[in-house]
Swiss-Prot record:
SUPFAM superfamilies in alphabetical order: Glucocorticoid receptor-like (DNA-binding domain), Nuclear receptor ligand-binding domain
Entry-linked PANTHER family: KNIRPS-RELATED PROTEIN-RELATED
Biased composition (Low complexity): 579-589
Record-level GO BP terms: estrogen receptor signaling pathway; response to cadmium ion; response to estradiol; response to testosterone
Gene Ontology, cellular component aspect: nucleus
Keywords: DNA-binding, Lipid-binding, Metal-binding, Nucleus, Receptor, Steroid-binding, Transcription, Transcription regulation, Zinc, Zinc-finger
Assembly, per entry: Binds DNA as a homodimer. Can form a heterodimer with ER-beta.
Pfam name, any one: Oest_recep
Protein name (record): Estrogen receptor
Family statement drawn from the similarity comment of this UniProt entry: Belongs to the nuclear hormone receptor family. NR3 subfamily.
Gene Ontology molecular function terms on file: androgen binding; DNA binding; estradiol binding; estrogen response element binding; nuclear estrogen receptor activity; nuclear estrogen receptor binding; protein homodimerization activity; steroid hormone binding
Modulating: annotated segments: 1-192
Organism encoding this protein: Oncorhynchus mykiss
Length: 622
């Protein structure tokens, strides 16, 4: 099936030069692979067999393509179709209207030409053709939650013409003035629950939902919702399995946009709400989470907002969002990556090469999960692509280190890099400089153990490390600052409020609450110091060219080197000297000193390492 594209879709991109996409950008902006899903309800509900009123009844069978041509089709009002093939999606004129009874009856697809109401057409079902002629069938998809019922009737298409006929299930009227503007009226709307995909009973707590999910969310926000997932916090939520895991069901409620106090704008309530158009500038600074436009308005655009945030353009659009602390904590706990295994059998005692091979391999695996975790931090995907890459490159080793500290908190004297990779201090002596880093890590683990770090505090500190790394420019001459630092500050405020909220509800006295908060935040400076030490050590290992490094780890390492070129470059000079060049496992040649190339202002989202020749992989910046 051929789908005609408009001129705007095939026009060349303007402005941005072509370049190869980096490994980090591919992980950040890669969309999930979608596979066509079978309808959860019987097909008869989506494509009901209908009978037109009057004397005769025309029977339609939409699945096998059968159509009774002998039965007359009579309706309460005449339906029209267009015979002009110039613009299949435009409104037909009065002169191009012909009565449906004056031409052979055939397959018609009734859709709307309005971009807000017209569903997307995609080839999904292919019923057999009639009379040996090719037929076109469409599976009606919408980008939003509601699915609209449309009638699909059979038609004979000429091989030389493409006719897309437009009508509706109800009576359509065309105005006689002008070019014949159509008035589209939707007859029936079937809406589904955004949480479990069951039939929605109404608009509850900011989204369309069923009675079961509405009642479950009401009970959860009114009482204690200390649910625990027995699996990996990724349980499937549908009509049959929604009761199997309360934790994942509540997480799905928050993800689809359920909020306490969500209210439809087109319905009155017990509290009269002031129209936003008359609020003025003061009302747009900070708004409660229940009054947000994209939360309280019915979902019209579906997932359009989530996809537009990664296009690298606008970044944060809209007012500063204030999210409830309970929701922030719940989302951060649900975003935690799963436990990893090294799956590499290396005989002990370790040598320098085997030790660093194990550690760099684990770091590369954790980086992939770290990027997936960062995309689940509340507000992170609303940032521009430049800011996302900047934050990840600035904090990746600190995030990995605090995760290592949390895994090792219950094992004194041990560092748990993975479930099957547990090291102690003595095993770090095989690598020069590694024992010092191990000592600092074990001391920080002991400090967190003494403070009895809670899981809620850990997830908050981890997110603070990610967002605080790019709050201020490391070097104003060599690093481009964040495009929207105010959005990052707003995200930091939400997470800090969540940390304070948890400490205040932990049972500590009023005097101990600010003291504990200060004790936790002061330890982040020690993690930053360990990260700098580890970065210097990794860069020296790369310059020695003894251990193969992976593409993503190399890009992260070199991106951090641009942000703090002084210390890391000095480590490279002390290790190899200015004339040494090392070759990575991917074949790219990198020198420890690049002269003026390391001090230029970095382009938004551009990677430092260019793997291979940028010939066929060049594409516009997304």
């Amino acid at each position: 099936m051929l789908v005609r594209q408009s001129h705007t879709q095939i026009s060349k991109p303007l402005g941005a030069p072509l370049r190869s996409r980096t490994t980090l950008e591919s992980h950040v902006i890669s969309p999930p692979k979608l596979s066509p899903q079978q309808p959860t309800t019987p097909n008869s509900n989506m494509y009901p067999e209908e009978t037109r009123g009057g004397g005769g009844a025309a029977a339609f069978n939409y699945l096998d393509g059968g159509y009774d041509y002998t039965a007359p089709a009579q309706g309460p009002a005449p339906l029209y179709y267009s015979t002009t093939p110039q613009d299949a999606h435009g409104p037909p004129s009065d002169g191009s209207m012909q009565s449906l009874g004056s031409s052979p009856t055939g397959p018609l697809v009734f859709v709307s030409s309005s971009p807000q109401l017209s569903p997307q057409l995609s080839p999904f079902l292919h019923p057999p053709s009639h009379h040996g002629l090719p037929s076109q069938s469409y599976y009606l998809e919408t980008s939003s939650t509601p699915l609209y019922r449309s009638s699909v009737v059979t038609n004979q298409l000429s091989a030389s013409e493409e006719k897309l006929c437009i009508a509706s299930d109800r009576q359509q009227s065309y105005s006689a003035a002008g070019s014949g503007v159509r008035v589209f009226e939707m007859a029936n709307e079937t809406r589904y629950c955004a949480v479990c995909s069951d039939f929605a009973s109404g608009y509850h707590y900011g989204v369309w939902s069923c009675e079961g999910c509405k009642a479950f969310f009401k009970r959860s926000i009114q009482g204690h919702n200390d649910y625990m997932c027995p699996a990996t916090n990724q349980c499937t939520m549908d009509r049959n399995r929604r009761k199997s895991c309360q934790a994942c069901r509540l997480r799905k409620c928050y993800e689809v946009g359920m909020v306490k106090g969500g209210l439809r704008k087109d319905r009155g309530g017990r509290v009269l709400r002031k129209d936003k158009r008359y609020c003025g500038p003061a009302g747009d600074r900070e708004k409660p989470y229940g009054d947000l436009e994209h939360r309280t308005a019915p979902p019209q655009d579906g997932g359009r907002n989530s996809s537009s945030s990664l296009n690298g353009g606008g970044g944060w659009r809209g007012p500063r969002i204030t999210m409830p602390p309970e929701q922030v904590l719940f989302l951060l706990q649900g975003a935690e990556p799963p436990a990893l295994c090294s799956r590499q059998k290396v005989a002990r005692p370790y040598t320098e090469v085997t030790m660093m091979t194990l550690l760099t391999s684990m770091a590369d695996k954790e980086l992939v999960h770290m990027i997936a975790w960062a995309k689940k931090v509340p507000g992170f995907q609303e940032l521009s692509l430049h800011d996302q890459v900047q934050l990840l490159e600035s904090s990746w080793l600190e995030v990995l280190m605090i995760g290592l500290i949390w895994r090792s908190i219950h094992c004194p004297g041990k560092l748990i890099f993975a479930q099957d990779l547990i090291l102690d201090r003595s095993e770090g002596d095989c690598v020069e400089g590694m024992a010092e880093i191990f000592d600092m890590l074990l001391a920080t683990v002991s400090r967190f153990r003494m403070l009895k770090l809670k899981p809620e505090e850990f997830v908050c500190l981890k997110a603070i490390i990610l967002l605080n790394s790019g709050a201020f420019s490391f070097c104003s001459n060599s690093v481009e600052s964040l495009h929207n630092s105010s959005a990052v500050e707003s995200m930091l405020d939400n997470i800090t409020d969540a940390l304070i909220h948890h400490i205040s509800h932990s049972g500590a006295s009023v005097q101990q609450q600010p003291r504990r908060q200060a004790q936790l935040l002061l330890l982040l400076s020690h993690i930053r110091h360990m990260s700098n030490k580890g970065m210097e050590h990794l860069y020296s290992i790369k310059c020695k060219n003894k251990v193969p490094l992976y593409d993503l780890l190399l890009e992260m390492l070199d991106g951090h080197r641009l942000q703090s070129p002084g210390k890391v470059a000095q480590a490279g000079e002390q290790t190899e000297g200015p004339s040494t060049t090392t070759t990575t496992s991917t074949g790219s040649s990198i020198g420890p000193m690049r002269g003026s190339q390391d001090t230029h202002i970095r382009s938004p989202g551009s990677g430092v390492l260019q793997y291979g020749s940028p010939s066929s992989d060049q594409m516009p910046i997304p």
